[in-house]
């Protein structure tokens, strides 16, 4: 089994809410399918991710279509980003338009506030067992890369769903970037279970955050100790 392979069964259930706008699972799948029409399977791609519908749709598309995905946070050091791009030579990069201003002749396609840039046409020799690479925490120094296989991604997600008894009726809220393992895990488990994720950009100590907790009847949220400091 592959992660997200059963998203279609949830259809009109609410997958995501961002800035009071509702996205069903059908909406998420339709947005994800836009990328599969452009990017070939087994492509090597880099996602500079924000917690928003476009990054999540691109991530879901990457998993479903077998891209080998490197996920970076939107605050990733630019020097590290360019070095990573030079070393890995990805086929495509998907990034927020404000992240970098690249003036070159590469093919570019724009999706809302994002740019999909074609970098390298050559086919990559990729182990099909691999799925994604995440960076360790820390964006100003030289973070290390952590590789996750398709199998690990799926089994870990299913184990967490079963242990925490996450159900379709559950509603959670984002508190961490999806580029980090814990933030991504919260997204994976709730989407895989057919639950609802509130996309949030407010810090947990803000009034707006706790207003969302009340307004959306949030069941639970996950975070790390450093967030409270």
Please place each PLM-identified region on the residue numbering.
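Conserved AMP-binding/adenylation subdomain of ANL enzymes
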Residues: 154-171, 181-220
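Flexible, low-complexity linker/hinge segments
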Residues: 82, 103-131
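Adenylate-forming
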Residues: 98-99, 204, 217-229
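Conserved AMP-binding/adenylate-forming
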Residues: 21, 35-75, 175-177
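Conserved AMP-binding A3 loop
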Residues: 24-25, 131-158
């Amino acid at each position: 089994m592959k992660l997200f392979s059963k998203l279609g069964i949830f259809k009109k259930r609410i997958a995501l809410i961002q800035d009071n706008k509702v996205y069903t699972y059908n909406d998420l799948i339709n947005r994800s399918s836009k990328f599969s029409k452009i990017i070939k399977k087994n492509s090597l791609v880099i996602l500079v991710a924000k917690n928003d519908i476009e990054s999540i749709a691109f991530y879901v598309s990457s998993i479903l279509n077998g891209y080998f995905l490197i996920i970076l946070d939107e605050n990733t050091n630019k020097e590290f980003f360019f070095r990573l791009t030079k070393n890995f030579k990805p086929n495509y990069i998907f990034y927020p338009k404000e992240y970098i201003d690249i003036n070159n002749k590469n093919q570019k396609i724009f999706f809302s506030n994002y740019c999909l840039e074609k970098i390298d046409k050559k086919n990559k020799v990729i182990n099909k067992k691999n799925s994604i690479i995440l960076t360790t925490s820390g964006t100003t120094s030289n973070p290390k890369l952590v590789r996750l296989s398709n199998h690990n991604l799926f089994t870990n997600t299913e184990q967490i769903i079963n242990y925490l008894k996450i159900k379709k009726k559950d509603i959670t809220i984002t508190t961490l970037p999806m580029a980090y393992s814990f933030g991504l895990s919260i997204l994976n488990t709730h989407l895989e279970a057919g639950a609802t994720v509130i996309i949030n950009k407010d810090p947990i100590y803000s009034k707006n955050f706790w207003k969302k907790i009340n307004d959306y009847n949030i069941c639970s949220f996950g975070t790390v100790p450093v967030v409270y400091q």
